[in-house]
């Protein structure tokens, strides 16, 4: 049973560096999910392409609940994800890695919880209010930082991610407002993904890859082409970072993530 999963974002569509890869289809209360399962250092790892193969699903149409539930069904306890981001912080340059520690949610139309009371399409028919003070698992963040340090990659140990609805890029005014609010980087996929993982008491962390400066900071027109091109340039480093981080993940979970539902239902 795999205990670790990788969710690949924009530009990360294949489980390279894994061996003995097989495809599986997982049925969930929220829909069907296709994943790939392979091995790394003798351990099974699940790979899920967030946008589908070839970036076929836009951020606001991703079935986040099905994706996270599918990983849970497979027995996954820890999730490492990647996110392509625009930078609002001049110190975070294109090509840099950012080990996210905080996020802000500005999405509008997504499904944010598994716990819809009696309307839940599974036997967990209750309402839960999980603590999200620290949205990213400290153990997984530490593993990513240790890996980046060992590999000699340029990385930032902290960063606040602003999640926008998309699929369009942001306006100059939006970026100015986000900067005032304290955002370092901006993207479209961390919400509700990170919160859903917490609701199922799974550990979750994300490494953001800066692909460009955000609107009004960059003097150029923003294009998805530049995102794809930079992610292609960083592709090998991203995969090396994720695999090395897996080596640093402790076997036993000692983080608060595993007890996220304690006290969340009022019982």
Curated annotation (Swiss-Prot):
One Pfam entry name: PNP_UDP_1
Keywords of this entry: Glycosyltransferase, Purine salvage, Transferase
Catalytic activity: a purine D-ribonucleoside + phosphate = a purine nucleobase + alpha-D-ribose 1-phosphate; guanosine + phosphate = alpha-D-ribose 1-phosphate + guanine; inosine + phosphate = alpha-D-ribose 1-phosphate + hypoxanthine
Disruption phenotype: Disruption of the gene results in a complete loss of ribose 1,5-bisphosphate generation from guanosine.
Annotated residues for binding of phosphate: 10, 50-51, 83-84, 189
Site (Important for substrate specificity): 170, 224
GO biological process terms, semicolon-separated: L-methionine salvage from methylthioadenosine; purine ribonucleoside salvage
Annotated pathway: Purine metabolism; purine nucleoside salvage
Record EC number: 2.4.2.1
UniProt keyword Glycosyltransferase, yes or no: yes
Binding-site residues, substrate: 188, 212-214
UniProt-recorded Gene Ontology molecular function terms: guanosine phosphorylase activity; S-methyl-5-thioadenosine phosphorylase activity
InterPro entries in UniProt: MTAP, Nucleoside_phosphorylase_d, Nucleoside_phosphorylase_sf, Purine_phosphorylase-2_CS
GO cellular component assignments: cytosol
Enzyme class: transferase
CDD domains: MTAP_SsMTAPII_like_MTIP
Other notes: Although this enzyme belongs to the family of MTA phosphorylases based on sequence homology, it has been shown that conserved amino acid substitutions in the substrate binding pocket convert the substrate specificity of this enzyme from 6-aminopurines to 6-oxopurines.
Family statement: Belongs to the PNP/MTAP phosphorylase family. MTAP subfamily.
Quaternary assembly: Homohexamer. Dimer of a homotrimer.
PANTHER family (alphabetical): S-METHYL-5'-THIOADENOSINE PHOSPHORYLASE
Known function: Purine nucleoside phosphorylase which is highly specific for 6-oxopurine nucleosides. Cleaves guanosine or inosine to respective bases and sugar-1-phosphate molecules. Involved in purine salvage.
Protein name stated in the entry: Probable 6-oxopurine nucleoside phosphorylase
Biological source species: Thermococcus kodakarensis (strain ATCC BAA-918 / JCM 12380 / KOD1)
């Amino acid at each position: 049973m795999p205990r670790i999963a990788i969710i690949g974002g924009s530009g990360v569509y294949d489980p390279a560096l894994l061996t003995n890869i097989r495809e599986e289809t997982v049925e969930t209360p929220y829909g069907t999910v296709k994943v790939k399962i392979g091995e790394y250092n003798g351990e099974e790892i699940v790979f899920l392409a967030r946008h589908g193969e070839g970036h076929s699903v836009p951020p606001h149409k991703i079935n986040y609940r099905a994706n996270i539930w599918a990983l849970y069904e497979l027995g996954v306890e820890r999730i490492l994800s990647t996110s392509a981001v625009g930078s609002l912080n001049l110190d975070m340059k294109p090509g840099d890695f950012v080990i996210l520690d905080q996020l802000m949610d500005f999405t509008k139309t997504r499904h944010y919880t598994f716990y819809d009371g009696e309307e839940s399409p599974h036997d967990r028919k209750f309402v839960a209010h999980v603590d999200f003070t620290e949205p990213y698992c400290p153990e997984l963040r530490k593993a990513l930082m240790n890996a980046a340090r060992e590999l000699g990659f340029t990385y930032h140990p902290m960063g606040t991610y602003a999640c926008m609805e998309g699929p369009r890029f942001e306006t100059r005014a939006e970026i100015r407002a986000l900067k005032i609010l304290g955002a370092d980087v901006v993207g479209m996929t961390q919400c509700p993904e990170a919160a859903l993982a917490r609701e199922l008491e799974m550990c979750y962390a994300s490494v953001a890859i800066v692909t460009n400066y955000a609107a009004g900071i960059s003097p150029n027109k923003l294009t998805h082409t530049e995102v794809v091109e930079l992610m292609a340039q960083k592709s090998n480093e991203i995969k090396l970072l994720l695999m090395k981080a897996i080596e640093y993940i402790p076997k036993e979970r000692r983080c608060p993530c595993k007890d996220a539902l304690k006290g969340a239902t009022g019982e």
